[in-house]
C-alpha cells in the first residue's frame, strides 16, 4: 500500500501535536504510507523496481521522493492521535513483535485514554489489556516479520498491512465527516469497523462490545466539534458502516462509506423554480409581459441565447425569471421551452466554503458539466456580479481561472443557457470592462413600473398578503401605499417599496389587534366580584323573560316542541357568528403611519391636534418673534400647504429668503418654527455660511471629490438631509458664502434633489429651506437719514422705501436665476421702541427659567423694564443691545448677590428702581437694598 499527498497541508489547530516533528517523521519513515497534509491512500500494490544498472539509484530516488511526499499524515493527526501511534509501537516492541498490528494499535489507544472511566468509558485499562494481548500475540505473530533488536527505538518498528488499512479507513472517516484532523476516535472507529480476528478476540476477552465502543467514539467526536462551534455538516448525519473483512481493501470501504450518493452540483446549489411554480409557491406576476417575451425571444436563439436583466434594486428582475417559470409550469411557452427547467443558482452557497485553492472553480465546472449533460436546464443567476470576477486562483483579477473566463466558452457555444440579473452600476463595473463576456449576454432593461402599474401589481398580490396577515386591504390602502411610497421614500424603487409598505402595515394591524384582545382579557380579570354578580343577575333575568315568553306564546300542539327548539337553534347560530373574529381592515391611515415611521415625515391624516396646531401656528410664532407679521405669515403659509398636500411634490416645501437689518429676528423665526412645528430646535439644520467662504470649502456640502482629503466621507448638507428628510435647513448669512455655492443651490431650489460625492441622490422635497441675509443693512442705516426715515412719513411708506432699497441690493448681489427660484423674499421691519417691551418679556422669561433651576424666583417691576428698554434700544442694531442690557443690569447683579450669600433657594428677588432712578434689589416684601447703577455704553 502507498500513500501520497495530493494537496497542500491544512492549518493545524493549536491543540494538535505541533511539536511531534521527530517522532512523527520517524513513524512516517518506517510506515512509508503517511504524508504531510491531506493524505489520499492509493489502493494499488507497489510495482517491482526495474532491474538494471541504475536500478539501485531509481529505488533510492523513489524512496527519497516517497519520504518527501509522505512527510507526515501526522500533521493532520491530533497530539493525542500521534501519541497513541507512538504508544502502539512501544507496545509492539514490548511484546517482542516485529511489526505494529491492529491489536497493538488498540493497546496504544487504550494507553492514551487515561480518563477515569477507562478506554471509551468501558472500564478497560492498559494493564489488563496488555496481559490479554500477550496470550493472543503468542499465537498470532506476524509471519516473516523480523524481531526488533534490543537497541532499536520503538519508532523503528514498521506497520503491518492491516494497520495501514486502519489508517486508511480513519482518513476516509475524517473526510466523510468533514473534519480537517484525525483524532484517536477516528482511529478507534476504523479499528472497530475492520473485521480483524485478533482485535475481535482481544475485545471479546476484555468483555467489550465493538459497536458500543464505536458509538461512544462517535459521540465524543460530535461533542468536541460542537464545543468548538465548528461542527461540520456531515458530522451529525454520519453513521458507522458495517464491518468488512480486513483484507477487503480500500474499495470495500469506499463502497460502504459512499453508499449514499452525494448530491450533484445542480441539486446542491440550485433551486428549481419550475417545481416551485407548479406547487404554487411563487407569487403571481402582474405585468412585465414585454420583458418576459423579450427573455423568451433571446432564449430561443441558436447561440448567445443568454439574457441579462438590468435594473435598479427592487424593480422586479427576479420576478421576471419567476414569471417565466410560471409560464413553463402552465405550458404557456413555445414548444422549445415546454420541457425546460428554470434553476436558480444560490451564488452565496456556491462560494461559501470554497477555502482551498481552485475549489470554487471546481464547483463551477461541475455545475456547467451537469447543466450540459441535463440539456433541459436554464440557469438563473441573480446578483451575477458576485460570481463574475471572483476566483481563488486568479484572485478575481481576470486571470486564467477567473469565473468569468470559465463561463465564456459554454455561453458562446450555447451549451450553458443562463438568465443573469444585476444592477446597472454593477454591470458597468464588471461586464463593460470585459467586452468578450458582455457580448455573450443580451441586455434586457427592466424599468421601474409606473404608479398605475404598481397598483395593479399590488392588487394581484393582495390576496396572498391578506391570507398571511389575516386582514383585509382596502383599495384606498393599495393606492395610498403606492402614492406615499413614491413621494416620501425616494431612495427605493417601485413596486418593492410599496409591497413592503402593505406588508408592514398588515403586520402592524395584526399586532394592534392582538394587543387589543390582550387588554380586553386583562380588563375582565380586573373586574370586581360585584360587577360579575351584576352581569350574572342580568343574564338570569333575561333568561327568565325569554323562557316566560316562549311558554306564553308557543302553541300547545305537538309541533310546540319544534317551536321551542327553534330559538335554541337561533341561539347556536348567533353563538357561532359571535365566535367568528371580525376581519382586520387595513386602510389609508395604517399605511400612512408606517410610511411616517419609515421616512420620519408626518404623512398620516390630519388629526384634531394637528389641525389645532396648524391653525394656531401664526400665534405660536408671534409669541417668540415680535413685529414681523409678514415673515410669520409667509412661513406659516408654506407649512400649511405642505401639510395639507397642495405644494409641488417635486420641489422643497418652500424656499424663503429673509432680509433686513441685524437683530430683528430672522434666525429666531426659523428657530421658533423648528420648535413649534418640527418638535424642537434641534430639528433645524443650521449651516453658518461664514464657514464656506473659500472655494475649496464648497465641496464640504456634498463631500470631497476623488483625490482630495475626506473623499468617501459624507457631505455636511446631503448626509444630514438624507438621514432626516423632514427638517428646516437654515443657511445663515448666505451672502458670506463663496459664489460657487449658489450653483449647488440652483438644483435644490428647482428640482428638489442633489447628488453627493458618492453619486447618491438626496431628496430635499420635504425640507423647508430658509436663507438669511444682512444685505442692505448698511444702505438702510444711511437711507434712514438721507431718505427721510425719521420724518413725519407713515410707517408703511418708510417700510416700502426700505424694502425697495433692499431689493435693489439683492438684485445687484445675487444672480437672476437664483432669485427667480426663491418662493418668497421677506424684508423684516426695523424694531420700534414700543415693541421692545414685548421682546424684553421674552428675554426675562428665559432668565426666570434659569433662576428657577436654582430654586430662586425673580420679579421685575415695570419701572425697571422701562429702564432696560431705554438703555437697550438702538434702531440700527435691533434686539441684541436689549439682551446685553438684561445681562448687564439683571444677570450680573443677581450673580454677584448669590455669590455673597444674600439669596438662597426658596427666595424671590425683586428688581426695581428707587425714587432717584437707581437700581435696587430686595427680597420680595422685605427691606430694599440700593445699588449704584454702573454706566455702560451699548
From Swiss-Prot:
Segments for region (Disordered): 234-255
Superkingdom of origin organism: Eukaryota
Annotated spans, Repeat 1: 84-145
Region (II): 586-777
Pfam family, one: Clp_N
One Gene Ontology cellular component annotation held by this UniProt entry: chloroplast
Subcellular location: Plastid, Chloroplast
Tissue specificity as recorded in UniProt: Expressed in stems, culms and leaves.
I: region residues: 266-519
Induction / repression: Induced by low temperature. Induced by drought stress, salt stress and abscisic acid.
Binding site for ATP: 311-318, 660-667
Additional observations: Plants overexpressing CLPD1 exhibit improved tolerance to drought and salt stresses.
Record's function text: Molecular chaperone that may function in heat stress response. May interact with a ClpP-like protease involved in degradation of denatured proteins in the chloroplast. Chaperone involved in response to abiotic stresses. Plays a positive role during dehydration and salt stress.
Protein name according to UniProt: Chaperone protein ClpD1, chloroplastic
Record gene name: CLPD1
Amino acid at each position: 500500500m502507498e500513500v501520497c499527498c495530493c494537496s497542500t497541508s491544512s492549518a493545524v489547530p493549536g491543540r494538535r501535536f505541533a511539536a511531534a516533528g521527530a517522532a512523527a517523521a520517524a513513524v512516517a519513515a518506517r510506515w512509508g504510507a503517511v504524508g504531510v497534509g491531506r493524505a489520499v491512500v492509493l489502493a494499488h500494490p507497489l510495482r517491482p523496481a526495474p532491474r538494471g544498472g541504475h536500478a539501485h539509484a531509481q529505488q533510492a530516488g523513489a524512496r527519497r521522493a516517497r519520504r518527501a511526499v509522505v512527510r507526515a499524515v501526522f500533521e493532520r493527526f491530533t497530539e493525542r492521535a500521534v501519541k497513541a501511534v507512538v504508544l502502539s509501537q512501544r507496545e509492539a516492541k514490548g511484546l517482542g513483535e516485529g511489526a505494529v498490528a491492529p491489536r497493538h494499535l488498540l493497546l496504544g489507544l487504550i494507553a492514551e485514554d487515561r480518563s477515569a472511566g477507562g478506554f471509551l468509558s468501558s472500564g478497560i485499562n492498559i494493564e489488563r489489556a496488555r496481559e490479554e494481548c500477550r496470550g493472543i500475540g503468542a499465537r498470532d505473530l506476524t509471519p516473516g516479520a523480523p524481531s526488533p533488536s534490543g537497541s532499536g527505538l520503538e519508532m523503528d518498528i514498521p506497520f503491518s498491512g492491516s494497520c495501514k488499512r486502519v489508517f486508511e479507513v480513519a482518513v476516509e472517516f475524517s473526510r466523510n465527516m468533514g473534519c480537517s484532523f484525525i483524532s484517536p476516535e477516528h482511529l478507534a472507529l476504523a479499528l472497530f469497523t475492520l473485521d480483524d480476528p485478533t482485535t475481535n478476540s482481544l475485545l471479546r476477552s476484555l468483555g467489550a462490545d465493538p459497536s458500543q465502543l464505536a458509538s461512544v467514539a462517535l459521540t465524543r467526536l460530535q461533542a468536541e466539534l460542537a464545543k468548538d462551534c465548528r461542527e461540520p455538516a456531515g458530522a451529525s448525519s454520519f453513521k458507522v458502516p458495517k464491518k468488512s473483512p480486513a483484507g477487503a481493501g480500500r474499495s470495500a470501504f469506499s463502497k460502504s462509506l459512499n453508499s449514499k450518493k452525494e448530491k450533484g452540483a445542480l441539486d446542491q446549489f440550485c433551486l428549481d423554480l419550475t417545481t416551485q411554480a407548479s406547487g404554487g409557491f411563487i407569487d403571481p406576476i402582474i405585468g412585465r409581459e414585454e420583458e418576459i417575451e423579450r427573455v423568451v425571444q433571446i432564449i430561443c436563439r441558436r447561440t448567445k441565447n443568454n439574457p441579462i436583466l438590468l435594473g435598479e434594486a427592487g424593480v422586479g428582475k427576479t420576478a421576471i425569471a419567476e414569471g417565466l417559470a410560471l409560464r413553463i409550469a402552465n405550458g404557456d411557452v413555445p414548444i422549445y421551452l415546454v420541457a425546460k427547467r428554470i434553476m436558480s443558482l444560490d451564488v452565496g452557497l456556491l462560494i461559501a466554503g470554497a477555502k482551498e485553492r481552485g475549489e470554487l472553480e471546481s464547483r463551477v465546472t461541475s455545475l456547467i458539466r451537469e447543466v450540459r449533460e441535463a440539456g433541459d436546464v436554464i440557469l438563473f443567476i441573480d446578483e451575477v456580479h458576485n460570481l463574475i470576477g471572483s476566483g481563488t486562483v486568479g484572485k478575481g483579477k481576470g486571470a486564467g481561472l477567473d469565473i468569468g473566463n470559465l463561463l465564456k466558452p459554454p455561453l458562446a457555444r450555447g451549451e450553458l443557457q443562463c438568465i443573469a440579473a444585476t444592477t446597472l452600476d454593477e454591470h458597468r463595473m464588471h461586464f463593460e470592462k470585459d467586452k468578450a463576456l458582455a457580448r455573450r449576454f443580451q441586455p434586457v432593461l427592466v424599468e421601474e413600473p409606473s404608479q398605475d402599474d404598481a397598483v395593479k401589481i399590488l392588487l394581484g398580490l393582495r390576496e396572498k398578503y391578506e391570507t398571511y396577515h389575516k386582514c383585509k386591504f382596502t383599495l384606498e390602502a393599495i393606492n395610498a401605499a403606492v402614492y406615499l411610497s413614491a413621494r416620501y421614500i425616494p431612495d427605493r424603487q417601485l413596486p418593492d417599496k410599496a409591497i413592503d409598505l402593505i406588508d408592514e402595515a398588515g403586520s402592524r394591524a395584526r399586532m394592534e389587534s392582538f394587543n387589543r384582545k390582550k387588554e380586553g382579557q386583562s380588563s375582565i380579570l380586573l373586574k370586581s366580584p360585584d360587577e360579575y354578580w351584576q352581569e350574572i343577575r342580568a343574564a338570569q333575568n333575561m333568561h327568565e323573560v325569554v323562557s316566560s315568553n316562549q311558554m306564553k306564546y308557543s302553541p300547545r300542539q305537538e309541533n310546540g316542541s319544534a317551536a321551542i327548539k327553534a330559538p335554541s337553534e337561533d341561539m347556536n347560530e348567533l353563538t357561532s357568528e359571535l365566535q367568528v373574529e371580525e376581519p382586520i381592515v387595513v386602510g389609508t391611515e395604517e399605511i400612512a403611519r408606517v410610511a411616517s415611521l419609515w421616512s420620519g415625515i408626518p404623512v398620516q391624516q390630519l388629526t384634531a391636534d394637528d389641525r389645532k396646531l396648524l391653525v394656531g401656528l401664526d400665534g405660536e410664532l408671534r409669541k417668540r418673534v415680535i413685529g414681523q407679521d409678514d415673515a410669520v405669515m409667509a412661513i406659516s403659509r408654506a407649512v400649511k400647504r405642505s401639510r395639507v398636500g397642495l405644494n409641488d411634490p417635486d420641489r422643497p416645501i418652500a424656499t424663503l429668503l429673509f432680509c433686513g437689518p441685524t437683530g430683528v429676528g430672522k434666525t429666531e423665526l426659523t428657530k421658533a418654527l423648528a420648535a413649534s412645528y418640527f418638535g424642537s430646535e434641534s430639528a433645524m439644520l443650521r449651516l453658518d455660511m461664514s464657514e464656506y467662504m473659500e472655494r475649496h470649502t464648497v465641496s464640504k456640502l456634498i463631500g470631497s471629490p476623488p483625490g482630495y482629503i475626506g473623499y468617501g466621507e459624507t457631505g455636511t448638507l446631503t448626509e444630514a438631509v438624507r438621514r432626516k428628510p423632514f427638517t428646516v435647513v437654515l443657511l445663515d448669512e448666505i451672502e458670506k458664502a463663496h459664489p460657487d455655492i449658489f450653483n449647488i443651490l440652483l438644483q435644490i431650489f428647482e428640482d428638489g434633489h442633489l447628488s453627493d460625492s458618492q453619486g447618491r441622490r438626496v431628496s430635499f422635497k420635504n425640507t423647508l429651506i430658509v436663507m438669511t441675509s444682512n444685505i442692505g443693512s448698511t444702505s438702510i442705516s444711511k437711507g434712514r437719514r438721507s431718505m427721510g426715515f425719521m420724518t413725519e412719513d407713515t410707517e408703511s411708506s418708510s417700510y416700502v422705501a426700505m424694502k425697495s432699497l433692499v431689493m435693489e441690493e439683492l438684485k445687484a448681489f445675487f444672480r437672476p436665476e437664483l432669485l427667480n427660484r426663491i418662493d418668497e423674499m421677506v424684508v423684516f421691519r426695523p424694531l420700534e421702541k414700543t415693541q421692545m417691551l414685548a421682546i424684553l418679556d421674552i428675554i426675562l422669561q428665559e432668565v426666570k427659567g434659569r433662576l428657577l433651576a436654582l430654586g430662586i424666583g425673580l420679579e421685575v417691576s415695570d419701572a425697571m423694564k422701562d429702564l432696560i428698554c431705554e438703555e437697550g434700544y438702538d434702531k440700527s442694531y435691533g434686539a441684541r443691545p436689549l439682551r446685553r442690557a438684561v445681562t448687564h443690569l439683571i444677570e450680573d447683579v443677581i450673580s454677584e448677590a448669590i455669590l455673597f450669600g444674600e439669596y438662597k433657594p426658596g427666595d424671590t428677588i425683586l428688581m426695581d428702581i428707587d425714587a432717584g432712578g437707581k437700581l435696587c434689589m430686595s427680597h420680595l416684601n422685605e427691606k430694599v437694598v440700593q445699588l449704584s447703577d454702573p454706566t455702560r455704553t451699548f
